[in-house]
Regions:
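A generic structural motif
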Residues: 1-3
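A sequence-level/structural motif corresponding to short, flexible coil/turn segments enriched
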Residues: 5-312
Length: 312
């Protein structure tokens, strides 16, 4: 965030490099997300394509869970590592996954340094602390809370409908008809964000291709909006979910989308009102919500547009 500056001058952003390091993995390893902890330590999350990730003794999962070949990639598990504030020490490292494939999308820490990881999984035995939410199928959304020392699963949920959830239109497939528009809008298929409120409730913005994704009573939008059918995917809506702090249950869950493809990418809470702001991409001309007085109250054209919505 830039401070006060003269808009007539050139801004030079020259941050100081605190540390840069390899993970030490002897297996292929690809990074997706990272977050700081309250004490200045640092978490990084990615995927590892087999045994050889440098897990630490006593970590929650020290062995590779397994997986399948997917689009000429795989198998892969989530791979989570925590570094000291100066990057000189590995505080812990762990796999996170079941017998199929997993991928992290977003991470955040609570005030105690516990780590919340949001992503997706196709494993029927993904580590969780409550039963599957929804019937599941394809990729499901997963949210997991690990203790600050990486040893204990404090809470974990797997949630989804019959088709892919948490997948923003698989990136391998570029549709000539433009049906991959929301993927292009943000650059890849691994898009969702997790945040916390002051009571440590967990909020997630993501997407679903399931017309039976689990929603809660009184949801803003209880039915699937629809979308485009592309080379590799079903129609897609955004989803917005709130979980209990220990992931013991879903406090609310709703679709958010019109008759085109929609995806929720980012979210933020107003610290004064508690209202939730959600941003994403859409090619729906009938995106839900009261647009009276909005900067643009109708779809402006093009393959995909961004959107911002406020939920009270």
């Amino acid at each position: 965030k830039a401070g006060n500056y003269d808009p007539k001058t050139t801004i030079v952003i020259d941050p100081r490099l605190v540390f840069s390091t390899f993970t030490g993995s002897t297996q292929d390893n690809w990074g997706y997300t990272a977050t700081p902890a309250p004490d200045g330590s640092f978490y990084a999350g990615g995927i590892a394509f087999g045994s050889g990730y440098p897990t630490s003794p006593g970590a929650f999962q020290t062995t590779f869970g397994g997986g399948v070949n997917e689009d000429n990639n795989g198998p892969f598990d989530m791979a989570i590592i925590k570094f000291s504030a100066n990057g000189s020490n590995r505080l812990f490292a762990t796999y996170l996954g079941g017998t199929s494939n997993e991928q992290p999308h977003s991470m955040i820490c609570d005030a105690q340094g516990n780590l919340i990881v949001a992503g997706r999984s196709t494993s029927p035995n993904y580590p969780r602390t409550i039963p599957q939410v929804g019937i599941g199928g394809g990729y499901d959304i997963v949210v997991t809370k690990l203790s600050a020392d990486g040893r204990t699963l404090l809470g974990s949920v797997k949630m989804g409908g019959i088709n892919d959830d948490g997948v923003n239109i698989r990136g391998k497939y570029v549709a000539p008809d433009g049906a991959d528009g929301t993927r292009r809008n943000y650059g890849d298929d691994a898009r969702s964000e997790v945040i916390l409120d002051g009571a440590n409730n967990i909020y997630l913005a993501s997407c679903t291709q399931s017309n039976n994704f689990p929603v809660t009573a009184g949801a803003i939008q209880s039915t699937f909006g629809g979308g485009n059918t592309g080379i590799s995917h079903f129609p897609q809506d955004g989803v917005i979910i709130k979980f209990a702090p220990n992931l013991s249950g879903v406090l609310f869950s709703t679709y958010f989308g019109g008759s085109g493809d929609d995806a929720c990418f980012v979210l933020s809470l107003n610290p004064v009102t508690g209202n939730l702001y959600v941003g994403g991409g859409t090619n729906s001309t009938n995106l839900p919500g009261d647009k009276f007085g909005a900067l643009h109250d109708i779809y402006q054209g093009g393959l995909t547009e961004g959107f911002l919505t406020q939920i009270r």
